[in-house]
Amino acid sequence: MDTWKVGPVELKSRLILGSGKYKDFGVMREAIAAAKAEVVTVSIRRVELKAPGHVGLLEALEGVRLLPNTAGARTAEEAVRLARLGRLLTGERWVKLEVIPDPTYLLPDPLETLKAAERLIEEDFLVLPYMGPDLVLAKRLAALGTATVMPLAAPIGSGWGVRTRALLELFAREKASLPPVVVDAGLGLPSHAAEVMELGLDAVLVNTAIAEAQDPPAMAEAFRLAVEAGRKAYLAGPMRPREAASPSSPVEGVPFTPTGPRPGRGPQ
């Protein structure tokens, strides 16, 4: 069985789902079932404030492992407070750390993220930090002891796909020195998830692309299959691209095979 771990938690599914933006809890539960997701993120701030669409959310997610997140935190201090509240509400030790002061592009603050991660680890949290695709920051977080690193593929909710591929490839090269790498944010299509998994990264987190689809359960299934296909492709050892064409069938001894000099090479 090809499993992976977040701290001591062993998981089979490499697709984590978010719980926001669904039209109702029934559709959300159907999508979770279709994705065969074991872990679903939940915004503690919205649950605690009883925001529209979040009343009764924890009850609706019964039977699924919850990953509280600190969405809405703009500073390390706010993130730490939300993480503590999340532990009280869910009983879970782990937390998806989000520190986002920028309301326009929703890009994470690297300095506040690092500061919050250090404090939360001191308080015995398993920290899963959302971050930009910055390998140096990832190694700093890993040195602190975070359970994962979660670089973005594109801005949250954009659906742009893997705009940061070149930087994510660096994460793939350096995986031996990193905790599990979960690509979070910006994936809009199942093919985007497959692309990430083909790099050899550990998992993806998807919310908007599924919740805003015309048929969320069907899209959730499509993402599940794409994640599985991408992972299998990576494990199968893909061929390396070549600079020139290479025939799939031998040409030696085939009737009418040219025997003269090849174009551009001159007399032999």
UniProtKB/Swiss-Prot annotation:
Record's keyword annotation contains Cytoplasm: yes
The protein's name: Thiazole synthase
UniProt-listed Enzyme Commission number(s): 2.8.1.10
Function, as annotated: Catalyzes the rearrangement of 1-deoxy-D-xylulose 5-phosphate (DXP) to produce the thiazole phosphate moiety of thiamine. Sulfur is provided by the thiocarboxylate moiety of the carrier protein ThiS. In vitro, sulfur can be provided by H(2)S.
Family statement drawn from the similarity comment of this UniProt entry: Belongs to the ThiG family.
Subunit structure, as described in the record: Homotetramer. Forms heterodimers with either ThiH or ThiS.
GO MF term (any one): thiazole synthase activity
Biased composition (Pro residues): 258-268
Active site positions, chain numbering: 96
GO cellular component, one term: cytoplasm
InterPro entries for this protein: Aldolase_TIM, Thiazole_synthase_ThiG, ThiG
UniProt keyword Transferase, yes or no: yes
Catalytic activity: [ThiS sulfur-carrier protein]-C-terminal-Gly-aminoethanethioate + 2-iminoacetate + 1-deoxy-D-xylulose 5-phosphate = [ThiS sulfur-carrier protein]-C-terminal Gly-Gly + 2-[(2R,5Z)-2-carboxy-4-methylthiazol-5(2H)-ylidene]ethyl phosphate + 2 H2O + H(+)
Region annotation Disordered: where it falls in the sequence: 238-268
Any single GO BP term: thiamine diphosphate biosynthetic process
Species of the source: Thermus thermophilus (strain ATCC BAA-163 / DSM 7039 / HB27)
Protein's cellular compartments: Cytoplasm
UniProt keyword list: Cytoplasm, Schiff base, Thiamine biosynthesis, Transferase
